[in-house]
Structure formats: structure tokens, C-alpha cells
């Protein structure tokens, strides 16, 4: 029942922590420090405490800052730097989207939330359709074999959206309002 669910949830988080620990210390990746899991068996509850660097999520940042073209280019370069590290470590993030990008107080963009990230070996042996549909590469959506390039597709889609008044690519222009 509930205990099995929570135990499975914690195991998935432990996988994420292992990935984040492997890539910590790189400029454009959220810095994970450590975590603690506290089980409360009498209440069938768990506390999961995660210590990371303090950052602002990209959506929150965008509520108080207008992203200039120069900042969007910087965002792309910073996340490409993060993806280069992921490529070296054979990690596919699989969920590049604004909610998983963070900004520090110097304006550096960082990739975070490796909750559904997988190593290349695991992904190739067991394909799954995980991610956010708006940013999902066609091969992931179609459950076809995929590799690390799916993250570049998602990043490109996100950058396109920032540079085109929040409009996703491949939508017919007839869906736009006259003021768009």
C-alpha cells in the first residue's frame, strides 16, 4: 500500500540524487549538496530534506524580468554547457523546460531537476515516454529509440518560445490573435 508507494518514491529520488552528485560542481548545473530521508513508520510518512544552492526558477525570474534576446542567447549557451557535461557523463535529462531551469543572483542559468534523467545505457534498453509534451522530441513521443539529442530538441523548442511571444513552433499561424 502506502508504504510500498513511498519506498518506491524514495528509491526514484535516490537515483536522482546519484545523478546530481555525479555532476555537481559544474557552473551551469544546480549544485546538489546532500539529502536526508527520515521515515516515520508510525504515521506512514517520510520527510525528504534536500540541501542545494539557493536559486530562482526561470518562470519566477521571468515574472520580474523581461528576457532580452541577449539573455535568451545566454540561456541557450549556459544550458548547452550543462548538456555538454551531461553528454560526457552519458546522462539524458529528458525534461528540458523553463520549470527545470534556474537563475542565480549573477544571472547565470542552471539546469536542475534530474528526476527523470537516465543514463544512456538505461534509456536505450528501456524506452519510455517521459517528459513534457510541449518540449518533447518526436522520437520520445513516438516511443522510438533516442539518445542525448532529445535534450537539444527540447532546449531549441524552449528558446524558440522565448523569442516568439511564448508561441510554440509548428502551430498554424491561424491560431494567433491579431495582437500577437
Regions found by a protein language model. Name each.
Residues 139-149:
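Conserved end of the kinase activation segment
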